[in-house]
UniProtKB/Swiss-Prot annotation:
Keywords: Hydrolase, Lipid degradation, Lipid metabolism, Membrane, Repeat, Transmembrane, Transmembrane helix. It is a multi-pass membrane protein. Residues 853-880, 1249-1276 form the PLD phosphodiesterase domain. Hydrolyzes glycerol-phospholipids at the terminal phosphodiesteric bond. The active site is at 858, 860, 865, 1254, 1256, 1261. The lineage of its organism: Eukaryota, Sar, Stramenopiles, Oomycota, Peronosporales. Disulfide bonds: none annotated. SMART domains: PLDc (SM00155). It comes from Phytophthora infestans. It is found in: Membrane. This is Phospholipase D. The chain crosses the membrane at residues 257-277, 305-325, 587-607.
Length: 1807
């Protein structure tokens, strides 16, 4: 029931008593009134309504659903979102009104039945229900049960009239309409019954009735249903489609047969055994014992062991029975649900008062509906219907209980038949004695004293079954009792109660199940003594039987209890039958059970059909009503526009009219006037007169027959033949290039959401900021600190949480990644977002077999209220935010890219996304990878198609997780397969469907009320009566867009009621309506007001790539079809932006998509016709996969490159190879480009990086565009791999343009996007029109020339990869090396002092070479001049894990530890640190250190160097550590055992001695062989002048942004005094550098540091300035150091120990007067770059850096990101200023001489 805030208003006082206010009704249909068997009866209705109250209700309804003004951030709750509680509110008296509208006689069976059509009114909603006499009987029975179990008393207040109990003819039953009406009304007056589940279910009252935004409920009720979708049947995929169809067709029928067979074959025999064995376990045992008096007495005792054994056996049998039942219950998949028929779906609720459905079956365009019959075959249910679509079938069974009843009766009959027929399987032999040879009782021994008394005495005999024989004994004597006796202990015996039966009892029929006994068993046969007819024989008589053997008959007698037996010398003759049991008997019995298992369900089916055919009960009444409603919806679906590209979504055609023409057209249609020949004034006059006449009619007739306007019931109708669908509302699109504009639009749309938000993504980061500071983030709030960092409240999780708290329901559907391959951490996303009940998150797939789970869900969808959708290639995740400037660095003090949002996937992919504020790479030295993407927002009918796709996927995931729908073989007893099962989604109703019902002519009564005649209608044909009709408004009202014509027209069609649709003609007000409901569309009241700025009206077709595994539907590849169609129909040019370009041609059996073939065919056609046709392809220079492109170890990076090059230019199936046979100049038709950007890093170095193109876009002829999430590869295009969605957007608005130097009408939307992209890539102004003609030779050559010029400049300045000059791996050797790693191993057999303990010559096979890059790739000796390098001895967080000395050496067990630590996490716990301490520090075998090109290391504070007091982590105290080092005169731990390698490894030219030359090529991770090392190394002497300056050359700056984390340390006086001179010197140095890079030379640091105080050998460096000398003198000896430390600590500021905020810790401070800018000053119109002059680089104050290590490039020094040396920046400045835009050539010859395809990876993963 609705909550207190629901939009279900309590009717007025007049409306509470009114039963006839259902609107102005037309006369009965001519079809109905023309029937011969019409009987009229009267139904009394109450008084009239007031017209003023109707108008008030009308206004309230109009105001309830239409949002007239912005909500200022507040959320308007929908009627079904107000109360989420599961408890149903009490139904107040008079809130539900009921009346019988009409009675119908239907002859669906042999016996006609009467169907009552009741009218239920609840609040502002009314509907009709269909029921018969059997439903009323069932209602009354359920009410009795409800009162008994809930109220604990019998139902006495309301009695079912006897006339309803009695069976009568249908024509006479119609006279009971008043009785039925009064009976239901009496039930509604009782408070308890009014709120009872049986009555509310009968009246179909549920909260879904009030859910206006989901559309009207055409039919509701409890039914049994099955969903036969994918994953609902085990092994649903077969090798043959015919076999698969047959399997699906008969699966549940065979399961039902198997179920009944299991009952008959297993459960039935076991139950019989239980019934006959219970007395054995639980009955007391009786024995004869000797009493004290010497007589025999019966002793009774309980067998305790038998009781427990019986309980155990009973429990096991019950468990087995329940197991079989539950097993087949899940196999059949039958569930009981409250099912609601909506215009778009079947919504199934677990309970009637639920607000969210547990299962939803969506209708597609071509869904089918058929009644259940023997031909249908799915379930063989005569009282049900089957609705089918591409996603499967749903079976609605309205008579499931009747089916169960007939099945149960048939089962019992078959079981009884098996028991009765089982005697036929035995070969009986009779044991019959000749009575003529016997003697009467008077002469029988042992009976001499027998006298006749009241107590019956039994005589008889017993025998022992011979060995090796099992027999079955029975007697035809009704009085005979056969028992199994226990072995006698004396002269008495006791019967075994487990084998005790009488011939005339049910035990007689149990036969082989209970009466078979084995060898050695004593079987007694006794009967009451008949003194007259019995004859006695002597005990011990032998009787021979051929099949059994000799039987010795011993006489026994017993009393009436037949419990204790005593021996007697004679016995009476009793004839019995004895049959031996053989294997033949058991086989026959099993065959009986098997035949019975098949006969039972078949008989049940036939009995159900027969009873239904006769019409004895009426489940078909409900079935027929359900079926007619579904069939009517089926007709409506088929009236829609056909689809394109084999898509699931219908084609939407937008129409464009201006305001005046739209108004005139609508009015002309309303008055049935010719538009061209009728003046506008005449149209207005006609329409106004119609409205006036309607108002007068309503006032003259009163409002007694008018329903409140809030019920949306209108009398205007259109017949089926004259129906003309109104023009659909227009579709509009708005472009969003790059994430800044996209996220801003999403933020605004999410903030304005009213009802629900749907999000689907490949990756969703809850910590993503949608708006960024300095860009589109709103100004600071008044309560914020103006000097502090601005608080960003646009984090995705915060925005969604705010809307969830406001009542908006949020559904997030994300891809569940394969953890071994991806690090998306979707589990973290789910945990972070699911913090409110209104936020639901699903991850899919849970388990996937296809290709080992490599396929993914790749859509990027955000849908707001199902009325505004964002579709494109942009994920809501890290690394995507960017704008048109595409900066590669973020030097601002208020960063735009925080934490992991500053990323470069090629350098380092995302890890630990649950820690969003950790840096992935070094911000000071490593550039971020700019991200280019294109998204769009759409409004109009296509939004419902996008929402349909997402809802279908959501519901499919729910159905896969729903244990009650699955029929897998492993689910039996688990009541809930998932603890929190999400609810399904129902599409919103944007057609504004409302129900309208006909009524009879009213007749005024004396008391002022009205009387309505209820017709009796005989339905001989179901097609005669339709359940509802469609009446749509002539002019659908839809919200206007920011551009283009206003929609709807500004002038109202009805001055009296603007929201009311126009009338088609005056006659339609009184025209007849068909019997049943009328479904009317009133778009103006149902469609939300959507604010869609900068939108253009166009046609939009939604396409997708889905299959069984992803969406539960047959494979759909409509995106590929759309691409091929647009390419084939293009006339002038194609512009393609895509992340990948992998396609194939005919004959290529590996790559299956044929986009490339369509492209070749189109170019071939252009060549043949001598047409100018251009193809622009813009794609990434390198795929964004982490890897080493110069390594021979091929990875995913090389694999994707291989397939892209194979598509473009390499191989016989490539594009250029195919074009060679078509034209000699393919370069005139197609060109490939990339994007690249340069900038200045915070460390002062110029750098470049590719702009990663992630968009999935194609523009054709400036008139059509395809945009979505689908890449050009098989994963996205084939449909059976990744799930995708895309939009085909065709312009409907055109403007003048130029194409091929000729006038051309170009589309407004497509050309707008294309020009925006061209201007951004080429660096043009926003109003530049030089690229307006993309086909002309001038534009073609200019674009190619710009790209070529930019490429040459980038290669000349940065020497970056990829490049056409790098044709093989050997070409990488010519690229400058910027960092190298020196590797050594310890030789434990050598003694220090005699030889080096650490040496490169100790390296073993499998170790790194002496000199390698970061990945272990050897570096040739002739490529490195060590004098140009310096040791990186700064200890970051990762290096602290190793035992690092002050020469930069890091120690570990083996070289693999270095790679693991470098590529894995950095937030190590204490346990992990202890592990490294024990394993790596104490057992170190190898060591490694890094050498970096001079000028590339970021400036650092001297206190951060390895010589700092604070950096000596290996010692217990700073003072003692420094004192020990000063006493030793050495600052290097390694100098005590070896000569510094940085000197010994140099030859006379400064090169590396002992390094390995690769001989012209490099091998990835080459295993180093110590035998190949030179034996003698050229060592320079101890002359310090010839030694390369390793330390002390670089000045130190305390606030470098690349510095890793360190705490504030107290400043020494020397540092404080030298601060000003440092800043002055640095400023002057920067200003005089042309390229903006600091001048290094021989300038010494003005600060007191160990850089300027000591040389490498520990001696005092004399080449220092005065301040350095003074500072160093304090540390010159043992006496001076103590005073220096004392003064140092005395001057420290205690506040410096405080840790700064997390945001400030990751970035450096800037000048207050500094103006933020996107790009460094190397671009045109800018002076020297600002990053070097920031106060953050020059301030004396130390700041805390990031905790992450300085990221090391995964691909070594050859990468898309490259830097410029300081010596080259002056020259580079002039060259870089000549770059225009971002466009560069795509390197088609990159690594053309190498094989890039990995042999171990499957091909389909990368294509």
């Amino acid at each position: 029931m609705p909550g207190p805030d629901d939009d279900v208003r309590e009717p007025t006082a007049a409306a509470r008593t009114n039963n006839s206010g259902y609107g102005l009704r037309a006369a009965p249909s001519s079809i109905t009134s023309g029937l011969d068997s019409v009987v009229s009866v009267n139904s009394y209705r109450s008084s009239e309504l007031n017209a003023e109250e109707v108008n008030v209700d009308d206004q309230e309804c109009a105001d309830s659903d239409i949002l007239e003004s912005p909500n200022d951030g507040m959320t308007i709750m929908n009627d079904d979102d107000a109360d989420l509680s599961e408890e149903e509110e009490e139904v107040m008296e008079n809130s539900i009104d009921f009346s019988v509208n009409r009675a119908t006689v239907t002859k669906a069976g042999v016996i006609p039945c009467c169907v009552f059509v009741g009218r239920v009114r609840w609040g502002t909603t009314d509907w009709e229900i269909y029921f018969g006499q059997k439903q009323l009987l069932r209602l009354h029975f359920n009410l009795h049960l409800y009162s008994l179990f809930n109220r604990h008393k019998l139902l006495r207040g309301v009695h079912l009239p006897c006339t309803i109990w009695r069976e009568k003819r249908a024509e006479k039953r119609v006279m009971d309409v008043y009785v039925v009406q009064d009976y239901i009304r009496q039930l509604l007056k009782d408070r308890d019954l009014r709120n009872s589940e049986p009555l509310l279910s009968f009246l179909e009252v549920s909260p879904s009735r009030a859910m206006l935004r989901l559309g009207p409920s055409l039919k509701e009720g409890y039914v049994h249903m099955r969903i036969n979708g994918p994953f609902q049947l085990p092994l649903y995929t077969c090798f043959n489609r015919t076999i698969e169809a047959l399997y699906r067709h008969l699966y549940r029928a065979w399961m039902r047969i198997a179920f009944v067979s299991a009952i008959v074959g297993f459960i039935f025999p076991i139950c019989l055994v239980i019934v006959t064995s219970l007395p054995t376990f639980f009955s007391p045992q009786k024995e004869l014992v000797n009493s004290d008096s010497g007589t025999k007495e019966v002793s009774t005792k309980l067998n305790t062991a038998g009781v427990f054994l019986g309980l155990a056996v009973l429990g096991g049998i019950l468990f087995f029975a329940v197991f079989v039942y539950k097993f087949f219950q899940h196999r059949l998949g039958v569930i009981r649900r409250w099912v609601v028929l909506k215009p778009s779906c079947f919504a199934a609720y677990r309970n009637r008062n639920d607000r969210e459905p547990s299962e939803v079956f969506l209708f597609d365009k071509n869904f089918t509906a058929r009644k259940g019959s023997y031909r249908q075959g799915v379930s063989w249910m005569p009282s049900g219907l089957v609705v089918g679509s591409k996603a499967g079938d749903i079976e609605i069974d309205t008579g499931h209980y009747y089916t169960r009843l007939t099945a149960f009766v048939a089962l019992m009959g078959v079981c009884y038949g098996i028991m009765r027929l089982s005697n036929s399987i035995y070969d009986f032999e009779y044991l019959s004695l000749d009575k003529s040879m016997g003697v009467p009782i008077t002469n029988a021994s042992g009976y001499e004293n027998w006298t006749e008394s009241r107590d019956a005495e039994y005589c008889g005999y017993y025998f022992i079954v011979p060995k090796g024989t099992t027999v079955y004994v029975e007697s035809k004597d009704d009085s005979a009792v056969i028992s199994q006796l226990q072995m006698p202990s004396s002269n008495s015996m006791t019967a075994n109660l487990g084998f005790f039966w009488q011939s005339d009892s049910m035990g007689y029929s149990l036969n082989v199940i209970t009466n078979a006994v084995g060898a050695g068993t004593m079987v007694s046969v006794v009967k009451p003594i008949d003194a007259k007819n019995d004859r006695f024989f002597e005990s011990g008589t032998n009787y021979s039987m051929p099949t059994v053997g000799n039987l010795t008959l011993e006489g026994v007698k017993t009393d009436i209890d037949v419990q204790s037996f005593s021996n007697v010398e004679s016995f009476c003759a009793i004839t019995v039958r004895i049959a031996p049991l053989t294997w033949r008997s058991y086989v026959y019995y099993i065959l009986f059970l098997f035949a019975g298992g098949i006969i039972a369900p078949v008989v049940g089916f036939l009995a159900n059909y027969f009873v239904t055919y006769l019409g004895i009960w009426h489940p078909h009444v409900r079935r027929d009503h359900w079926f007619r409603c579904v069939r009517r919806l089926q007709k409506l679906k088929r009236q829609e526009t056909s689809t394109r590209f084999n898509s699931f979504a219908p084609q939407h055609i937008s129409t464009i009219d201006d305001d005046e023409s739209a108004t005139i057209t609508a009015k002309a249609k309303a008055a049935k006037l010719a538009i061209g020949n009728t003046p506008t004034s005449n149209i207005n006059q006609v329409v106004d007169s119609v409205v006036k006449q309607e108002a007068e009619t309503a006032s003259r007739m009163g409002t007694g027959n008018l329903a409140p306007a809030s019920s949306r019931v209108d009398s205007s109708t259109q017949s089926e033949d004259s129906f003309e669908a109104p023009k659909p509302p227009p579709s509009s699109v708005s472009w969003h290039v790059d994430a800044e504009d996209t996220y801003a639009a999403m933020y605004k749309a999410i903030s304005n959401a009213k009802y629900e938000i749907l999000i689907a993504g490949w990756w969703v980061c809850p910590d993503l900021f949608l708006l960024r500071p300095g860009r589109k983030l709103p100004p600071r709030e008044a309560d914020e600190d103006p000097d502090g960092q601005q608080v960003n409240k646009t984090m995705l999780r915060q925005v969604l949480m705010k809307k969830a708290e406001a009542g908006v329901k949020i559904y997030v559907l994300i891809y569940r990644e394969v953890k071994l391959a991806l690090t998306l951490n979707s589990a973290y996303t789910k945990r972070s977002l699911m913090v409110h009940p209104n936020i639901r998150v699903l991850r899919d797939p849970i388990f996937q077999i296809q290709s080992l789970g490599f396929w993914s869900h790749h859509e990027k969808i955000v849908c707001i209220d199902q009325s505004l959708a964002f579709v494109g290639g942009l994920d809501l995740c890290f690394g995507r935010y960017d704008h048109h400037g595409h900066p590669i660095s973020d030097p601002s003090d208020d960063p735009v890219w925080t934490g992991k949002d500053y990323s470069n996937p090629i350098i380092k992919d995302f890890v630990r996304v649950n820690k969003p504020f950790e840096d992935l790479i070094d911000r000071a030295s490593q550039p971020r990878m700019p991200w280019h993407d294109v998204h769009c927002s759409i409004s109009g009918p296509p939004v419902q198609d996008v929402a349909y796709h997402l809802i279908q996927r959501w519901n499919f995931v729910c159905s896969k997780n729903d244990y009650q729908l699955r029929t897998g073989w492993c689910i039996c007893f688990r009541s809930r397969r998932f603890k929190f099962l999400p609810k399904c989604l129902v599409p919103m109703d944007f057609n504004g469907w409302t129900l309208q019902y006909p009524s009879s002519d009213p007749e005024p009564m004396r008391d002022g009320s009205t009387r309505t005649t209820i017709p009796l209608v005989r339905e001989d044909s179901l097609s005669m009566v339709e359940p509802f009709q469609v009446v749509q408004s002539v002019n659908p009202m839809y919200p206007c867009t920011a551009t283009g014509p206003q929609w709807p027209p500004t002038s109202s069609l009805h001055p009296i009621n603007p929201m009311r649709p126009p009338l088609t003609s005056a006659s339609t007000t009184t025209g007849p309506l068909d019997d049943g409901e009328v479904l009317r569309a009133q778009r103006g009241e149902s469609i939300l007001q959507v604010f869609h700025p900068s939108a253009n009206i166009c046609n939009i077709q939604v396409c997708r790539s889905v299959s069984m595994w992803s969406a539960g539907v047959p494979t759909e590849a409509s995106i590929q079809a759309a691409y091929m169609d647009v390419i084939a129909n293009s006339k002038h040019f194609l512009y393609i932006e895509n992340q990948f370009f992998v396609s194939g041609m005919d004959g290529n059996g590996i790559v299956r998509n044929r986009i490339l073939q369509a492209l070749v065919d189109r170019i071939e056609r252009a060549v043949q016709r001598d047409e100018k046709f251009r193809v622009y392809v813009v794609m990434p220079l390198l795929p964004a996969f982490e890897g080493n492109i110069r390594s021979h170890e091929l990875t995913n990076l090389h694999a994707v490159m291989h397939w892209q090059f194979a598509t473009i230019c390499r191989g016989r199936y490539s594009l250029f190879e195919a074009l060679k046979g078509v034209t000699n100049h393919p370069e005139n038709y197609v060109a490939f480009f990339g994007l690249r950007k340069y900038g200045i890093m915070p460390n002062g170095c110029a750098a470049t990086e590719q702009i990663y193109i992630h968009s999935k876009l194609m523009i054709a002829d400036d008139r059509c565009a395809i945009l979505g999430s689908a890449n050009i590869n098989d994963r996205s295009m084939n449909g059976d791999r990744d799930s995708e969605i895309a939009l085909v957007i065709e312009d409907m608005q055109y403007e003048d343009g130029v194409m091929n130097e000729k006038p051309y009408r170009r589309g407004v939307a497509a050309s707008k996007l294309r020009l925006q992209l061209f201007r951004e890539h080429l660096g043009l102004a926003d109003d530049d029109l030089s690229v307006a003609d993309p086909t002309s030779d001038h534009t073609w050559q200019a674009i190619k020339s710009t790209a070529s010029s930019n490429t040459k400049i980038f290669e000349a300045v940065f020497d970056c990869a990829p490049s056409n000059r790098m044709r093989a791996f050997v070409n990488f050797q010519s690229i400058e090396v910027t960092q190298i790693f020196e590797n050594q191993r310890m030789n434990v057999l050598k003694v220090p002092g005699r030889s080096h303990v650490w040496d490169a010559q100790n390296l073993k096979d499998g170790d790194y070479a002496p000199w390698t890059d970061v990945n272990g790739v050897p570096i040739a000796a002739d490529r490195v001049d060590l004098r140009d390098f310096e040791v990186d001895n700064y200890r970051d967080k990762k290096k602290k894990l190793f035992s690092m000395d002050h020469d930069g050496w890091c120690y570990a067990r083996n070289f693999s530890i270095f790679q693991e630590v470098r590529t894995m996490k950095t937030d190590y716990k204490k346990r992990e640190k202890l592990q490294h301490l024990v394993a790596d520090r104490l057992m170190a075998q190898v060591r490694r250190r890094r050498w970096v090109k001079k000028g590339l290391l970021p400036p650092r504070d001297p206190r951060e160097s390895s010589f700092s007091l604070a950096s000596d982590d290996e010692e217990h105290g700073r003072f003692y550590s420094l004192w020990r080092r000063l006493q030793q005169g050495d600052f290097s731990r390694s100098n005590s055992v070896s000569t510094p390698t940085n000197f010994s490894q140099l030859d006379t030219d400064g090169g590396i001695s002992g390094s390995v030359s690769v001989g012209g090529t490099n091998h990835g991770r080459r295993l180093y062989n110590s035998n190949s090392m030179p034996s003698n190394a050229s060592i320079l002497g101890d002359n310090p002048t010839t030694r390369p300056p390793v330390l002390g050359d670089a000045p130190s700056y305390p606030n470098s942004p690349s510095v890793a984390s360190f705490q504030h340390t107290p400043q020494s006086p020397a540092i404080a005094t030298g601060a000003r001179s440092v800043r002055s010197a640095r400023t002057s140095s920067l200003l005089c550098t042309g390229a903006g890079v600091r001048t290094r030379g021989n300038t010494r640091s003005a600060r007191g540091s160990f850089y300027g105080m000591f040389s490498v050998t520990g001696n005092r460096n004399l080449d220092t300035d005065d301040e350095s000398s003074d500072a160093g003198s304090e540390y010159g000896g043992g006496h001076g150091i103590r005073a220096s430390l004392k003064r140092w600590y005395s001057t420290m500021d205690v506040l410096d120990f405080g840790r700064r905020s997390k945001f400030n810790a990751e970035y450096f401070d800037t000048d207050e007067d500094h103006l933020h800018s996107d790009d460094p000053l190397l671009e045109d119109g800018r002076g020297s770059y600002h990053a070097a002059t920031r106060e953050g680089l020059l301030t004396e104050e130390a700041v805390e850096g990031s905790d992450d290590e300085d990221a090391e490039c995964q691909i070594g020094h050859v990468q898309t990101a490259a830097t410029v040396r300081k010596e080259d920046e002056t020259r580079a400045r002039a060259q870089l200023s000549e770059i225009r835009g971002h466009l560069v050539e795509f390197p088609l010859d990159f690594l053309v001489e190498e094989i890039l395809k990995p042999s171990v990876l499957p091909a389909d993963i990368h294509i």
